[in-house]
Structures are given as C-alpha cells and as structure tokens.
A protein has these predicted regions:
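Aromatic/hydrophobic beta-strand junction motif of beta-rich domains
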Residues: 47-55
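Signal that preferentially marks extracellular ectodomain short beta-strand elements
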Residues: 89-108
C-alpha cells in the first residue's frame, strides 16, 4: 500500500471516529443539544434545555440529581419536569426559576437531564420513548 492510500484510510477512520459520538447521543429519535454533557450552567439562572426530536408525540424533560432510571427507562423528575415546545425545528424547555436558597438552580452540584417523547399509538407497548441521559453541573 502506498503512503497516499494509507493517508486516505487514516482520514476516513478519523471521520468515522468523530461521527460515532454524535450517533451515540441519539436514542429513540431524541438528540439532546443543550446543555451539553459536562457543561456548567450558571447558578441563579434558568437554562433552556434544547433537543431535536424525530417522531410524533409530546416531549417532556426531567431533571434529577441521580442518573438512575426507573422501569420505563426515565430518570426522576424531582428537581424539574416540564413539557417542551417546538420552536424552529428544535424542542425547548425553560424551567421556572424560584429565588430561594434550596431551589436546585441555586444549589451548585451535578445534575442529569433527559427528554422523552410520549407516543402510544400503533401498538407501542412502551409509550415513553426516552432519550439519552445528559450530565451537567450547576455552578
């Protein structure tokens, strides 16, 4: 094999390796956009959760201090739960902010968010089409 053909193979391998994290970030047609994994959102402000969703049904967002999933594959919603609305092809959810010390957006730490689509038509036995869990920090 010539050096020129080896460089083509190497470039192709790099492109494929770079594409795989994006593929892994989508589950059941739900792709989280922001906050991104391991991002830090400012304490005392409400972030906007954004996701791209393929398929019909309502889209909901859960925020939890734990990444543990229940039997349906979704995390708890103890910190926040809300219905996302579609704006320009992207679903968005901005939690209501409460200005007291114990509120989660005023409590620095690690949190997890997950979007899921509710679609029960067509004989689907599991109505919750959950997306990937994303770890982020409030700080």
């Amino acid at each position: 094999m010539t050096l020129r053909s080896l460089s083509g193979v190497f470039v192709t391998a790099l492109l494929l390796a770079g594409a795989s994290p994006a593929l892994a970030a989508t589950k059941h047609g739900v792709t989280p956009l922001s906050p991104k994994a391991n991002a830090t959102v400012p304490s005392g402000q409400s972030p906007t959760f954004k996701m791209r969703v393929k398929g019909k049904g309502q889209v909901w967002v859960h925020v939890c201090k734990s990444n543990k999933k229940n039997g349906d594959g979704v995390i708890c919603s103890e910190e926040s739960i809300g219905r996302a609305s579609k704006k320009g092809g992207v679903f968005q959810y901005k939690p209501k902010f409460f200005d007291f010390d114990e509120f989660w957006l005023n409590s620095p730490g690690t949190y997890y968010w997950q979007a899921h689509r509710i679609q029960c038509e067509g004989g689907v036995s599991d109505c919750l089409q959950e997306g990937p869990v994303v770890k982020f920090k409030v700080g």
